[in-house]
Amino acid sequence: MKTVLVFGTFDGLHNGHRFFLREARSRGDYLVVVVAPDRAVQELKSREPRAPHEVRRAAILSENLADDAVIGDEEQDAWKVLNRYKPALICIGHDQDALAKALADFIKKERLPITLTRLPKI
């Protein structure tokens, strides 16, 4: 089974998110969405999220956009979810440059057998 992982805030689920998640899901057998915790949204976007992380997680699951959705680590760049799910592939959004670099550095440092791929914009 090929597990695919994606990361995001998903604060106000919209058609761009839906496209991204469907595209990621098509790349494997099992899609796990890692929803940024509220504190991370505050740090990344310099504002409070519109909806708490549990509501954002539930929205993804209620639309059947993923096989599982989890709340990300409170500690930035801990990547505990990688050990938990052992993805073969991580899909990166068109606007996730900082995430792509941080993940690439971690994967290289830890010598993990994970491929990163950037998905197109809608």
Regions found by a protein language model. Give the residues of each.
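Nucleotidyltransferase catalytic core that binds NTPs
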Residues: 1-122
